[in-house]
Amino acid sequence: MPTLDAPEERRRKFKYRGKDVSLRRQQRMAVSLELRKAKKDEQTLKRRNITSFCPDTPSEKTAKGVAVSLTLGEIIKGVNSSDPVLCFQATQTARKMLSQEKNPPLKLVIEAGLIPRMVEFLKSSLYPCLQFEAAWALTNIASGTSEQTRAVVEGGAIQPLIELLSSSNVAVCEQAVWALGNIAGDGPEFRDNVITSNAIPHLLALISPTLPITFLRNITWTLSNLCRNKNPYPCDTAVKQILPALLHLLQHQDSEVLSDACWALSYLTDGSNKRIGQVVNTGVLPRLVVLMTSSELNVLTPSLRTVGNIVTGTDEQTQMAIDAGMLNVLPQLLQHNKPSIQKEAAWALSNVAAGPCHHIQQLLAYDVLPPLVALLKNGEFKVQKEAVWMVANFATGATMDQLIQLVHSGVLEPLVNLLTAPDVKIVLIILDVISCILQAAEKRSEKENLCLLIEELGGIDRIEALQLHENRQIGQSALNIIEKHFGEEEDESQTLLSQVIDQDYEFIDYECLAKK
């Protein structure tokens, strides 16, 4: 992700109604980054193989059918032998050590100097099961830390693994795919090493209708890792190679294939408008919207994330998502039983609301406000925060009539209640929204009615109390609202205060306190 903006930078997005639409659109990415910062990716970076076996030879036995158990010293001696059977026995034993579910001895195997010989075994085309065991062992070493993955890369494994993608032995080929996926998943450096070694055409050539589903899952996952990470992003050439395959994979029925294909697209759209354009121009949006209706959480989450990323783009890109039917689905997702989905849906809607007023009008046309208000009232706090951002964007860019509809939706009651929230940013944003709505009401000569409504909701008491908040910005914002919009009551309180002073009573300087 790009460098995260400071919280105050994000807050500026919502402060002034009438801010230029293009500027608000440019600032959308900060909202995306805020959500991404707080949430770990659900997709696995690396995977360790514990269960695979080579179909040509039983994995627990030697060629003579006798189970083998070797010490580390015997393994080292075996892998350095010129006897293929001894090499196989030693490599298989090392692989089994590396396949332990708990505490596999990755460091021990690396320090024993086994990687160079295992890389050599990848080239042993006369012994496919030796190739398989070596590829499996390297897969599991590459599933470890970046330092352990580096040992595999610097051992020269990438090119021989790519060559194994052309192996006639399906198990060997699939294991090579898995190893490359682990290497690419480590970060942009090794991802680019795999790309520049020309792995992508070989991976794409493997995709076929007759491919076993486990194999196709591994290919899709490896492709997603080739789309993953930034600083730098994957090169344009790689993206252009992979995109058609991802569109093809999105038509599959397997949820794991769909999930990883969607995650790949989410990585590709988590960037500049140009990168978003590369994806939306393929025509993928209608299919993504369909996948947003999936009952499988592992499909719904990345498809929703991808569409959410897309609407951080230009007005035109956002309109393409709307035209694809996004707003038919998002209001339903606000009512999903998973708070994580509610939050992502609210975030996506907040980015639509950051656009021009005709996008806000489409939000109203699809009746987004009722479920949003329900979340503000009853959602988990992390979801309420995202809903507040959406309301703030709405209020910042809305026309007068749209603001009236916002007030009529009942949004003020939960906003007033959230003024006691422990999150400084959220309180500041709510105060800005209230100020924005009051200013609009003043232009329509409706301020008195709105002030009465805010008073009935307990808003005046809460805003007055915030003048004493330990955060100076909150105190000043609250003071500004009271002075500007509830001036008559302020005049009465000043009269009472003067009477107290005349009677020589001790008093507290609230304005001074508010500025501390």
From Swiss-Prot:
One of the record's GO molecular function terms: nuclear localization sequence binding
Keywords: Nucleus, Protein transport, Repeat, Transport
The keyword Plastid appears for this protein: no
ARM repeats: 103-143, 146-185, 188-228, 231-270, 273-312, 315-354, 357-396, 400-439
Biological process (GO), any one: epigenetic regulation of gene expression
Substitution effect: P212L: In OZEMA17; uncertain significance; decreased function in protein import into nucleus; decreased interaction with RSL1D1
Keyword Transport in record: yes
UniProt cross-references to SMART domains, sorted A to Z: ARM (SM00185)
GO cellular component: cytosol; female germ cell nucleus; NLS-dependent protein nuclear import complex; nucleoplasm; nucleus; spindle
InterPro entries: ARM-like, ARM-type_fold, Arm_3, Armadillo, Importin-a_IBB, Importin-a_IBB_sf, Importin_alpha
Location, primary (coarse class): nucleus
Domain of life the protein comes from: Eukaryota
Pfam families in UniProt: Arm (PF00514), Arm_3 (PF16186), IBB (PF01749)
Domain IBB: from-to ranges: 1-57
Subcellular localization, as worded in the UniProt entry: Nucleus
UniProt disease annotation: Oocyte/zygote/embryo maturation arrest 17: A rare cause of female primary infertility. In affected women, ovulation and fertilization proceed normally but embryos are arrested at early stages of development or cannot establish pregnancy after implantation. Inheritance is autosomal recessive.
Physiological role: Functions in nuclear protein import.
The protein's assembly and partners: Binds very efficiently to importin subunit beta-1/KPNB1 via the IBB domain; this complex dissociates in the presence of RAN-GTP. Shows a limited binding to the RB1 nuclear localization signal (NLS), but not to the SV40, nor NPM1 NLSs. Interacts with RSL1D1.
Record-stated family: Belongs to the importin alpha family.
PANTHER family the UniProt entry points to: IMPORTIN ALPHA
Protein name listed in UniProt: Importin subunit alpha-8
Source organism per UniProt: Homo sapiens (Human)
Recorded name of the encoding gene: KPNA7
